[in-house]
Amino acid sequence: MSDSAAETRPALTPPALTDDDILQRFLRTKNQPTGSQTLGFRLLSVSQENRSVEVAFEARAEVLLNPMKQIQGGYLCAMLDECMSVACMVASGMTHVAPTVEMKTSFFRRGMPGALRGVGRVVKWG
């Protein structure tokens, strides 16, 4: 990779927005995507330095449960995807969106309705 290519990478660009600016943008938005609304998405904290976000979800029983009264796995994957995509946006200083090309998930416990917390962190950019 040339030096000029490295300089244009979003993760190396000095942030134009503060962490609080980004958080306030998310909290003030009136056009939250329908999927985010369905999942009960709420951004709790942002760290551009750590390339991470903390997110809350409210898993409503009347919407997200399977016949076993547990959160359907596809909804849990969507929650994870939200954490990943918002972390990528934050890592880029809100200049890039990273679509999910591939995602592998292993479930170790069932998800139950109510409040859930997720953390997204960019480990490697590019």
Language-model-detected regions and their locations in the chain:
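Terminal targeting signals and extreme-terminal segments of soluble enzymes
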Residues: M1-G126
